[in-house]
Amino acid sequence: MKDLSNENIIHVNKNGIQYIQFRKLLEYKDIISHAYGMGLDRNYRTSRNNGDIVYNKSVNDYNDLCTEIGINYINCVKPCQEHTKNIRNVKQKMNKGKLDFEQDEYKATDGLITNQSNIALSTTNADCILLMFFDPIKKVIANVHSGWRGTLQRISVNAVNKMKSEYECNPKDIICCICPSIRMCHFKVHSDVQEPYFNEFRDLKDIDDLIVSVPNEDRWSIDTVGINKIILKQVGLKDENIIDCGICSVCNSDLIHSYRVEKEGYGLGTAIIELK
């Protein structure tokens, strides 16, 4: 079995569960629990629209993953993820005896923050960027889904601003961990995406390295992960506190769900982070 471990992450394969953990966040394992759950035999798709069989399997998969990392799966809260820039502060769970999945209160929401213990913030992806944030000083966490639309709307910056306004977090204290996602090597787009990206980020110093014309094609490669890193540093995060797993979901589609590879019927991975 391929091992994706590197200087920033460890790849755990245990009891039929595969997940990634960030070495930096493991330094605070007495305060937080976290993981990025993966594996093509697991599917963290939580929408009821896919039927009870898919939903019940997802609940079981969440239970298995959460058990491995010391979280009660009932603590999970997940936004509806509609490619918005909206962040919601979770002050308490809505359902005491079951998962807070796809709640009306989390519609038009793609990121969550909290300073409460035993609330496990969850997001899912199949190529989109997921970012887990942690302020060890204020003891605040966030979990953000940033697809290409979310990145264009700077949702990661919105999360930092929400942490500042709600909990007085100092950006220099915030750690941001970037989960597996599609990378520049495979994120190739047409002008309908390239043009708004260039217009939004044209002032970035390295824009010509972040948006690159594909030779002999009417397409462009965009480094959405690189853009997130730069705009997070612009709002005060330290370079050493932005931890990238460096893993492309398409390049590693034998282990990680990828919409571009799986197409219809694609599965989802999940990022989970909880304050103890």
Segments (PLM) and residue ranges:
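Active-site microenvironment for binding and transforming phosphate-containing groups
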Residues: 1-276
